[in-house]
From Swiss-Prot:
Its EC number is 2.7.7.6. It comes from Aliivibrio fischeri (strain ATCC 700601 / ES114). This is DNA-directed RNA polymerase subunit omega. The gene is rpoZ. One of its GO terms (biological process) is DNA-templated transcription. Residues 69-90 are annotated as: Disordered.
Length: 90
């Protein structure tokens, strides 16, 4: 198991507070959103995997925001299509 130091990840993000927010968002994505890890899992928990991804520069706040916006737009489009289908079939 590769050791992750918080300091390495803090240097990528800027401060510890943002690191907590970003790493928890990413860990939640992997746990509940079915998102795959971008680094080898090596039997690590999702929180450690998230920190490793941040440390390697694979995850940033901007990237998470963009992915979430895209997913929300796709979900909104699917819901709109479903509603449109229902109203046209009446």
């Amino acid at each position: 198991m590769a050791r992750v130091t918080v300091q390495d990840a803090v240097e990528k993000i800027g401060n510890r507070f943002d690191l907590v927010l970003i790493s928890s968002r990413r860990a939640r994505q992997m746990q509940t959103g079915g998102k795959d890890a971008l680094v080898p899992e090596e039997n690590d928990k999702t929180t450690v995997i998230a920190l490793r991804e941040i440390e390697e520069g694979l995850i940033t706040k901007e990237l998470l925001d963009a992915r979430e916006r895209q997913e929300q737009q796709e979900q909104d489009a699917a819901e709109l299509a479903a509603v449109s289908s229902i109203t046209h079939n009446r």
